[in-house]
Amino acid sequence: MIKQRTPKKVIQATGVGLHSGEKVLLTLRPAPVNTGIVFRRVDLSPVVEIPASYEYVGDTMLCTTLHHGKVKIATVEHLLSALAGLGIDNAYIDVNAPEIPIMDGSAAPFVFLIQSAGIREQNAAKRYIRILKPIRVEENGKYVQFLPHKGYKITFTIGFEHPVFNDRPQTVSFDFSGTSYVKEVCRARTFGFLSDYEKLRECDLAKGGSLDNAIVVDDYRVLNEDGLRFESEFVTHKVLDAIGDLYLLGSSLIGAFEGYKSGHELNNRLLRELMIRQDAWEYTYFDTENYLPAVHPEYYPVEA
């Protein structure tokens, strides 16, 4: 049986909010079986809980933002990506601000945080969503789709007419039966164009944005002194984002996802379309009588 997982102990981290520029304290806590991932705004009285669910996504401009009434938590995708990548099913995430800290712009600091807390298996079967039929959402030449697949595979293409991108599309594909999220995906940082960053500053946004937490590109080159961490970092970050956005289904996936020049909005629309099409998916669990999905060994049993 593939079991549910939760952090072994409470652990904290501090960072800066990308848009507020203010210091944020994040606390990761273990949670009982079948809790799911739950964000908590502990700076409010009473504390407001927001489940990590596609139904609570209220804004997808620049990042994925969860809303519960007038309360929000922004930039959840990198942390969710790390939780998904390490197979964490249940956790409480306490924050004292309306956004998750941006850290270095990747999911690697969150992976380190979770690994530092330790991972504990729980006495309940992990739930998966298995894709049974193709589902596709498209708009203005961009698209996202789910396809049936025995394991979990993500393919993404970006395209920018810019010298840094060699004026042509970039594509990567990760099949997680043989790919390590920790080694090959989590270190990819978010990226943006200097011209857009300046416009955001004028709108009182991106106050916490810097070369320390994003790859910044001007009209010709990458401005970060150390350049890229690896050649496919731009498009791999889009895979990282997608993994986080897809985890808002509340379960790990058995299927293939393809994104073409898409972003958080299309990702969320795809989740909503999938849930409506109940003939296109099913919940499944894996025990000794059921076949195991093709997933990387880092998902398999850990020390209790």
Curated annotation (Swiss-Prot):
GO terms for biological process: lipid A biosynthetic process. InterPro entries: Ribosomal_Su5_D2-typ_SF, UDP-acyl_GlcNac_deAcase, UDP-acyl_GlcNac_deAcase_C, UDP-acyl_N-AcGlcN_deAcase_N. Its EC number is 3.5.1.108. GO terms for cellular component: membrane. GO terms for molecular function: metal ion binding; UDP-3-O-acyl-N-acetylglucosamine deacetylase activity. Keywords: Hydrolase, Lipid A biosynthesis, Lipid biosynthesis, Lipid metabolism, Metal-binding, Zinc. Its cofactor is Zn(2+). The active site is at H264. Pathway: Glycolipid biosynthesis; lipid IV(A) biosynthesis; lipid IV(A) from (3R)-3-hydroxytetradecanoyl-[acyl-carrier-protein] and UDP-N-acetyl-alpha-D-glucosamine: step 2/6. It catalyses: a UDP-3-O-[(3R)-3-hydroxyacyl]-N-acetyl-alpha-D-glucosamine + H2O = a UDP-3-O-[(3R)-3-hydroxyacyl]-alpha-D-glucosamine + acetate. The keyword Lipid metabolism applies. Catalyzes the hydrolysis of UDP-3-O-myristoyl-N-acetylglucosamine to form UDP-3-O-myristoylglucosamine and acetate, the committed step in lipid A biosynthesis. Belongs to the LpxC family. This is UDP-3-O-acyl-N-acetylglucosamine deacetylase. It comes from Legionella pneumophila (strain Lens). The gene is lpxC.
